[in-house]
A protein has these predicted regions:
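Cleavable N-terminal export/targeting peptides
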Residues: 1-49, 365-384
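Surface-exposed strand-loop-strand hairpins of Gram-negative outer-membrane beta-barrel proteins
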Residues: 42-43, 74-103, 198-201
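Outer membrane beta-barrel transmembrane domains
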Residues: 81-92, 235-384
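Short loop/turn motifs that connect adjacent beta-strands in outer-membrane beta-barrel proteins
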Residues: 40-43, 56-65, 77-79, 115, ...
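Residues on the lipid-exposed face of transmembrane beta-strands in outer-membrane beta-barrel proteins
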Residues: 56-59, 70-72, 106-110, 120, ...
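Transmembrane beta-strands of outer-membrane beta-barrel pores
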Residues: 72-78, 122-128, 154, 171-177, ...
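Outer-membrane pore/translocation modules
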Residues: 126-254
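Residues that define the transmembrane beta-barrel architecture of outer-membrane proteins
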Residues: 64, 100-104, 139-146, 163, ...
Length: 384
């Protein structure tokens, strides 16, 4: 039950021109599973991302500058789907699975030069899983899979203040546990069992995240398009139960790729300095097959995706940026996994109706910034 997991490592970052649309999914995404939190509930894709380009007061980061941030993502998934068809009978009979996920991301970016930067991200997950007609509640908490990414602007920010594209490549490190166990009591019998993979803090494998961020200023608006895809270098993770599962294709959890795409427009409110409204579509999910040929795409996974509309606001002041968005799902699809296809089945997954996202960043400027970089930072903060 349940869809993807939740990406925790992915942050879509773009700093430039006039507006910094810094919010996003957290990313973990971008969709996004701490290894699996992106999508919705059980699917596992976790992300707190950023949207847009640089803000009107900070502009591009100057060489030697630091930016620190905290991202937050909350979702409550309980709406079951098989394919794109909602399974209404689950809530009517009270058999729905309810996943509650709270994901925080702590990250820091260091600007190496005018074009290049590095970012380190550490996620923290707190989650619970409960079948409505059962008294047993499964829980997990801990550090998720951390990441380190290098990012670079295609064009020199000192020359391109009205639009640019940033590309990033990094490593997702298996710092989160993928075998969290709970001790439960059922029918007078006490046992210790692994929790469902949708609330495991880690995936148990090394990943290669790559991302892009693009923005273009037009009049007083900024249009943005951000995305992230994480390729996993491992096929199978932890065993799903303490005993051998007779269904050999799914006795282990799959270590899944995950992705996030989002775009939209940011419009400043002229009467309130530093306030910007955001709106655009968002898509995040987990594919049925991984990109890298490291296995047979077996193991247990809940592939699928969710498409949402995401309105939000952002407030910028003195290099501090606070963003809040709410993603409302308008289309959800639990696609078939490779074991589903081989056995003729089609599993279900629980999705969220709403995903709540918040992000706060602040900057620490390098005191010994050169005259050239000072001019660069000042120019980037001006409207075109």
């Amino acid at each position: 039950m349940g869809f993807f997991r939740v990406f925790s490592h992915t942050r879509t970052v773009a700093r430039s021109g006039r507006l910094l649309v810094a919010l996003g999914a957290i990313s973990l995404s971008l969709l996004v599973c701490v290894p699996h939190a992106f999508g919705q509930g059980c699917i596992v894709a976790r992300s707190n991302g950023e949207q847009g380009g640089p803000d009107s007061e900070g502009g591009y980061l100057a060489s030697g500058d630091w930016e620190f941030g905290i991202g937050y993502r909350h979702q409550f998934s309980y709406i079951h789907f098989v394919g794109a068809t909602e399974q209404n009978y689950r809530t009517q009979l009270g058999t729905q699975v309810e996943n509650k996920i709270n994901l925080e991301n702590f990250y820091a970016t260091y600007q190496i030069s005018a074009r290049f930067s590095v970012t380190a991200d550490i996620p923290l997950l707190t989650a619970s899983r409960h079948t409505n007609n059962s008294s047993i509640i499964y829980t997990s908490a801990g550090i998720g899979d951390s990441s380190v990414l290098a990012q670079g602007w295609i064009w020199d920010p000192r020359e391109k203040t009205s639009g640019n594209i940033q590309l990033g490549l990094g490593l997702l490190l298996p710092t989160g546990k993928d075998n969290v166990m709970n001790t439960i009591s059922s029918n007078g019998v006490t046992s210790t069992v692994p929790v469902d993979y949708s609330i495991q803090p880690g995936q148990g494998g090394l990943g290669i995240p790559w991302q892009w961020s693009a923005f273009k200023n037009w009049r007083t608006n900024q249009f943005y398009f951000n995305g992230s895809y994480t390729m996993m270098t491992k096929d199978l993770g932890a065993r799903r139960s303490n005993t051998n599962n007779p269904i050999t294709l799914t006795q282990f959890n799959a270590v899944t790729d995950q992705y996030l795409m989002e775009g939209g427009v940011a419009h400043p409110i002229s009467r309130i300095r530093g306030l910007t409204v955001l709106f655009g579509p968002r898509m995040e999910g987990v594919p049925a097959r991984n990109l890298l040929p490291v296995g047979d795409n077996l193991g247990f996974r809940r592939p699928g995706f969710a498409v949402s509309v995401e309105p939000g606001i952002q407030y910028t002041r003195n290099g501090n940026v606070l963003s809040i968005t709410i993603a409302r799902a308008i289309y959800r699809d639990r696609t078939r996994s490779v074991p589903d296809v081989l056995t003729g089945g089609h599993g279900d997954a629980a999705f969220a109706n709403w995903v709540w996202l918040a992000n706060y960043t602040f900057r620490v400027h390098h005191l010994d910034t050169s005259h050239a970089d000072q001019g660069h930072a000042a120019a980037a903060g001006k409207a075109d």
